[in-house]
Amino acid sequence: MISEAPVETCNQFVFLAFPRRPGWKPKGEQPGQVLCTRPSGRGKMKLAASNNSLLCFSFNLLWSAAMNHRAAGLTHFGMQHDDIIPPLEWVDILVDDLEASSADVISSVVPIKDDRGITSTGVRNWLTGEIRRLTMHEIFQLPETFTIEDVHAAGINADPNGNPADEYLIVNTGLWVCRFDRPWAKKFPGFRTQDQVRIDADGRCEAVSLSEDWLFSEWAARNGLSVLATRKAALGHWQDGKEYRNDSAWGTCQTDPGEVVKVT
């Protein structure tokens, strides 16, 4: 668990990235859903949007733009997906937790868009490839902002037969902030996905994938970054007029049903 002490800062300068998809109008920008238009109430911000259907390329365009602006004194990089409806001043909420803990990355918990209450936040064992996603029921058994150590303390492991030291926190890129004034930011090679078709034990073809957010999480862990996940910024994940929210324990699944195919 991290400190709850707020951090007062006058030099906060956030590059806020908005990856967009061609032809898609973000629901958060419609009348009555304008909360995302004031992400911060302090410091300076530089806003940038991309418009590309290639997800990782879109992210990398924005990260590159931020890197090229880094000399102007950027302190943080943040990102909001076009289907996320966050609270007012969500950037400040995340930055306060980030600074209070001296962590490198903080990511909001985002439920998947169905009635199960499964999130894309979880734990992964990088030796065995086992993944366990956290459900909204489990999220509310953890501190409001938590680390991989908090997850293990709650008895949750990606691989019950593995070594907890080989596990790391996997987080989402829907609504997140990172420190941008630390040396690691210049070393990050960019976002990517890992996709393949392979033959399973029964001789059948199967498609497997590791998403860009989970691969970023792996890179962060391998490079010694401190990563946090949080539900402190109460948000909605928008789909067809409905918000799948992260501010209560809900869903038909108490635990991950284990449907994610491991990739090693």
Predicted regions located by residue number:
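C-terminal catalytic/acceptor-binding lobe
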Residues: T9, I170-N172, R182-T264
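Short, high-confidence coil segments that cap the C-terminus of an alpha-helix
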Residues: L74, S102-A103, L225
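Acidic ATP/Mg2+-coordinating residue in the GHKL
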Residues: R21, N52, H81-D82
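Conserved catalytic core of nucleotide-sugar-dependent glycosyltransferases
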Residues: P87-I199
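Short beta-strand-to-loop acidic/aromatic patch adjacent to the donor-nucleotide binding site
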Residues: G73-I85
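Active-site-proximal specificity loops/subdomain of glycosyltransferases
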Residues: K25-T75
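Short, well-formed alpha-helical segments that are part of the catalytic scaffolds
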Residues: M1-F13, F18, P22-P39
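Anion (oxyanion) recognition and catalysis
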Residues: S40-G41, E99, A221
